[in-house]
A protein has these predicted regions:
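Short hydrophobic/aromatic beta-strand micro-patches
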Residues: 18-20, 106-110
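Long, charged/polar, surface-exposed segments that mediate recognition or autoinhibition
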Residues: 96-98, 115
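Short loop/beta submotifs within extracellular cysteine-rich repeat domains
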Residues: 90-91
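Core segments of cupin and vicinal oxygen chelate
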Residues: 20-77, 114-117, 121-122
Length: 123
């Protein structure tokens, strides 16, 4: 049965989800050694001392610097993009799920009990 969409033409799915972590190394360790995600691309640092391209393209402070960004494969779902930012106006309070910008990611596993045991063992 064909479904006619009024949405974005040619939309096929989600490619990646970007996350800015307060501690890049700790987040990378969790993604790689607890979840088992596979890193496949890294770049950085980059920013600008003399233009507003960070503000214009990424909606961050013009002098913000992306220290590192690393992409991870996550099974057959969207990839995870991990960021480490440094910015003069950076807020360092984690949003609650009810706050604007609050979020969560749900993973699909074959055995929820085995997955929970694995996560608890790495707590």
């Amino acid at each position: 049965m064909a479904h006619e969409s009024k949405g974005l033409p040619g939309l096929r799915g989600t490619d990646h989800i970007g996350i800015t972590a307060p501690d890049f190394d700790e987040a990378a360790d969790f993604l790689e050694n607890v979840l088992g995600l596979v890193p496949f691309y890294q770049m950085g640092p980059f920013g600008s001392d003399d233009s507003d391209w960070m503000k214009d393209l990424l909606n961050v402070h013009p002098r913000a610097v992306i220290r590192r960004v690393r992409h991870y494969r996550c099974g057959h779902g969207p990839n995870i993009e991990l960021f480490e930012y440094e910015s003069p106006d950076q807020r360092k309070v984690m949003p609650k799920n009810s706050d604007w910008g609050g979020h969560h990611i749900t993973l699909y596993v074959d055995d929820i009990d085995a997955a929970m045991d694995h996560l608890r063992a790495h707590d």
